[in-house]
């Protein structure tokens, strides 16, 4: 991400910042949050949410990692949101935090979460059925 000055204005006015976490934003987000002077968004504040909390993460290193090893992520693959189960964890984290920040709408957030979870589980069952003939097949991806 190439940070823009317009991000500072958005951060100054924000009630909640949801970060991918796993140090994906480490190169640009902390400085912007600091410059925004929005105390709610600082780590540990109610206005900051690391979406990765509670998610299962692949490729989490148990050894020392450095840049000489290439594009590695010491806290695991930051693309953790791609699994339906992690999608439920993330949505639950967001719903819970929104309910804390905006308690008058907590019932609305819980209702929307329940609907999202139901739809995601239905979709996941369809996807599992579609992919089951390929169980055990190796797949290579690149990005």
How would you name each of these model-derived features?
Residues 1-143:
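Extracytoplasmic metal-acquisition and chelation regions
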